[in-house]
Amino acid sequence: MLKIGITGSIGAGKSFVGKLLRERNFQVLDADRMVHELYRDCVELRAEMAAFFGEACLTPTGVNSALIADRIFADASAREKLEKIVYPYLTRAVDVFFNADANATGVANSADAKGAAGAGNATNAGVKSVRFVEAALFSRAPSLVEMLDEIWIVDAPERVRLQRLVARGLSENDAARRIENQRGACAPELFPGKRICTIMNDGDRSQVESQLDDLLEVLK
């Protein structure tokens, strides 16, 4: 089975590409959503988060994202600590997803690795067995990168990314700060030994679909 990572800097549109893959009935694990589920359900992870960020970081449904975001954007060492806490749990969940029985019952686009085996690739007859993981910054999680055969990088012009973030409700300054914080984090050279493919997403759905279908054709 081929294991492919989908990544891209903030505002590039990796989630849109993941959505298109789900529409084609591919199995895609949303790593960001999985992390939120772990924040909510994993007792051990919640304890580690509280030990470092304080009990105030926890909520009944997960964590106080605003509090944590303020810490990690102001302090690079806090971001590194967060990654060291979270990534081992996420890596285990992704491993379960990749190794789940392809014929097991589940929902193909679920972020829950316990039920992520899904319904297969019925709408893509001829495409070899493949599963996708969508994540923001694979380069900061070497253990995840090691699992992957290919990495598809979704990119967009910086002005387009800035506009998308502002449309989500961020101030222009905050959006620019977040873009700067991730600058270079999805560069192809950060993934030596992996087949790299780039999908440009400037907002034209038909062009994104065309690029995606070309990549899927190679998998047949």
Give short role names for the model-derived ranges:
Residues 33-106, 123-129:
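ATP-dependent small-molecule kinase phosphotransfer cores
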Residues 27, 33, 150, 195-197:
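Well-ordered beta-strand positions
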Residues 15:
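Walker A/P-loop
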Residues 95-99, 126-127, 131-164:
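ATP-dependent NMP and nucleoside kinases share a basic, alpha-helical "lid"
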Residues 10:
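The conserved Walker
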Residues 140-146, 166-219:
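Small-molecule kinase domains that catalyze NTP-dependent phosphoryl transfer to phosphate-bearing small molecules
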Residues 6:
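Hydrophobic anchor at the beta1->P-loop junction of P-loop NTPases
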